Amino acid sequence: NLDFIIVDMPPGTGDTQLTFAQEIKIDGAIIVSTPQELALQDVKRGIKMFDKLGVKIIGLIDNMSHFVGDDGKKYSIFGEGGVRKTAKEFNKEFLGEIPINPEIGKQGDLGSPIVESQPDHEISKIYLNFAEKIKSIYL
């Protein structure tokens, strides 16, 4: 049985997203964005498009929200709070943040998702938390 299928689409509201939403019954969309203003403009158009098409928006995720330097300080190099603010503006749930962490790319390059190879890693816990939130909506 297939409970969920997640489709990673290119940014924006172009033909890919529109055709997908019109041709396939979608139970919900999760919008993932970096916190830059230009990216958030696409997010706002995407929210309006999905709302118009009757596709439920499960929530928004802030990707590459920050990184923690060797000094232990948090650096928000792409801006801070934009995705959360956009979620609030459109009355959508803010699901959380994914910080920049080189381990994500490293494990991906090795063909081993971080949630499998390092289930106790902070990033794994973030991903699993998203999965639980999404699951709780549908199950």
Question: Can you say where each PLM-predicted feature lies in the sequence?
Answer:
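C-terminal boundary of histidine-terminating zinc-finger modules
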Residues: 110-123
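Charged catalytic carboxylate motif
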Residues: 42, 122, 126
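Alpha-helix boundary/capping detector
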Residues: 46, 112-113, 130
